[in-house]
Amino acid sequence: MEYTIGDPSSHLLNKKIFYDKVNSDKLKFIDFLLEGNAFSSLKTSFEENILNNYSKREIQLVIVYASKKKIGDEHRNLVQNVCYLDYSIVKYFQVISKIIKKSAKYEFFDFLKLDFDKIGESIKRSSLTPTEQFQGHILPEERSCFQAGFKIVTFYMDANALLKRAYVLRNDGWRNFGNVELYQRLLISKKIKAMRKYLHEQSRVFVNNIIVTLSSKHIKLYDKDKNLLTVDSSGCIKEADTKAQPALIEIENKPNIIGIIDGQHRSYAYHEGDDVYEETIQKLRTIQNLLVTGILYPENITTEARLRFEAKLFLEINATQQGASSSLKQTIENILNPNSSTAIAKHIITKLNESGPLLDKFEEHWYESDKIKTASIISFGLKPLIKFSGSDSLFKLWNNSQKEKLLEKEFNDQLLNEYKEFCVNEIRNLLIGFSANITKENWAISRKNSTAILSVTTINGLINCLRFLIENNKTGDSNYYRKCFEKISGFNFKSFKSSQYRKMGESIYKECFIE
């Protein structure tokens, strides 16, 4: 575990040679730790708790780098084969582990990219990919009315088996699908405790079924006579029956393969805890009494299409419930309509926050109240800049012969991603040139000190300046902007009110780009 409280950029780069050396021969590094006098306490702990059960070759070694300050993508790309434990991820696992206790280990193992088959007792198994079988039924698309290739399987599963394999796309979690927002909320401690009390007192299952998604590459299906059903990459079963049929469902024993769409609280109520209910729930955890309805999607489906399908399903289940907030519905609508200006703008904000001059400046998580809020930047800054029309839009500037296809109803994820990347690069170039002419003391969030200039108003002013540049054919690269913004030193940012984005943008344009 490597951690720092200072600026991680130079600190991380200085560690690259050491990290590469460790990763090149992990066994040799373990020997070094155990043989050196400086690590005698570590050696004692290893001998007492680990080496009496496992060999050194069975030890998995991961370099974990923790910094409270966010590390930009440009530095992560230089120092690879390191697990970056960002502060937001620390906060996430802190919340999750307080609620579901030891059961949080499965998700943490997945975050560390540890091989599930090489952890604990799994190492001793002779089978390379252990599986478990569950009795159930297959409902083909003719009966479910889902699109071709999507099957519904229902089966009973014990909570222990489900929790080992499950994942939930929580919006404050660590999973990152790049172009797709995540939407499910964090677990609610009060709700989990109430459900555990119910399980303890009633000693019976919840009557509702758990809705999940599965990929056909992680399961095998057998008919009632235990004959293997062949599922091709498009999700079609060669020996298909158009009626519901009994089946044996064999699922790999791997983490992160069953996505819980509805029922995360009912599932995680069975977690491995330390409360007064654990003795009862421990017995229930291994009983196959959870009714699971799984949507089996084809192996050849793209990640974006799969996540859109899951989001639509989640919205259909939760839209009429009291707890479905407008922000949740908006997030899912952005997933279902990725070509919308709001969805594109939110993606741009995320990318600007990951690297460049605005690294870690935007509010992303519930505890980041001291950072820049993004709602007004999305609505009044980015949306007019990235719209698919107008003489002042990045769409006009984008030199792509296929760009008109984005106006069609059919999704083109690759083309859309190219446009998003273009927008991010153009905005970042402007910011690089601008920030090069601002002192470090002033390039800070304005709420923290009187001389700082970073605020919603300033960022929207710069975005509006870029619109003027596009309209007047005065755009360029970061070096061009750096030269032009040399005139910005005497600009009075504080004289503009919070709603005067356009006025500030025009003033910056005239000050720095008009001879």
Give, region by region, the residue ranges found by the protein language model.
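Short acidic loop-to-beta-strand element that houses the catalytic metal-binding Asp/Glu
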Residues: M1
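Accessory terminal alpha-helical modules
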Residues: G6-E515
